[in-house]
Amino acid sequence: MVYHVQFPGLGLDLTVNRVALAIGGFNIYWYGVIIAAGMLLAMLYAFRNAVDYGIDSDRLVDVVAIGTVMAIVCARIYYVAMAPFAYQSLWDMIDIRKGGIAIYGAVIGAFVFGALAAKWRKVPLLPLFDLVSLGFLIGQGIGRWGNFVNQEAFGTNTTLPWGMYSEGTEAYLKSVQVTLPAGVTVDPAAPVHPTFLYESIWCLVGFAVLASFYKKRRFNGQIFLGYIIWYGLGRAWIEGLRTDSLLIGNTGLRASQLVAIGSVIVAAALMVIGLRNAKGKPLMVPLAVKDLKKQAEAGDRFTPDTLPVGAPHAEFVKATDAMNARLDALDLSEVEIEEIETPKE
């Protein structure tokens, strides 16, 4: 489907085709391509900076793979669970090519299953959460443009210069007049808030803020809590503008808004506790050990090095390589013979 998207206040008139590529009778949609691009950039950021968090990039691969797959699965489950009777078949429920995923489902799935994978692969949990939170902001900031191509995730009417109109927004608003959240009225033929754009900007600004702060973090998990607070505040506001919110049953309550507000409150409380506990204690980062088996065999003969959290990236790379080279060179072939004292007669 092709949409003619207008921004009357800006004098812009765009033609947007939802289909990126057609192979035989199978369409590949821009929505999926954009989501995948956001994920890829998030992964590249995580792998490049893993060493700064004391995380081995080889073990991170498994954690990211599991977390990514389960993020997609849980994002769809969350979305379908809010309106299970809207789907005619099991295939309709699992087909995400046309959209229909919920970001909070993705967040829950990624962090829960990522935590399980981290335990399995012996990746430090809170530093992992700090790292992938920044990746999430990249992925969300880029991925929201998939909503633009689909002409979804927009808001109520606006007279602001960047108000958006298309036949897609008009058709959707005409079809949902009786199911809009309580107190929401719209004119289908008038421009609407491009809330996908608001969230994209909010996430990318959040990434810039938290990424510039990560070398100053006071405790492990602080960046993760900052992400929950930052994203939750923005989502609570933006969700209030949207016309396609997932509602909780027949209550009229917006699911994402409640989750956002609740998560902000909990994260803010944990942030205060974490800062109090970290007062006067500089954060040191244990460097990532590649060969965990040899480390275990070495016992007291090998202790991982640490660096202060504010050390430059290049120093983390150099020190980590040197430490692992030292472990590789450690000779464990000699069997230590315990000296036994001969009892006195």
Question: Where would I find each of the regions flagged by the language model?
Answer:
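A feature for loop-to-transmembrane-helix boundaries and adjacent hydrophobic helices
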Residues: 1-345
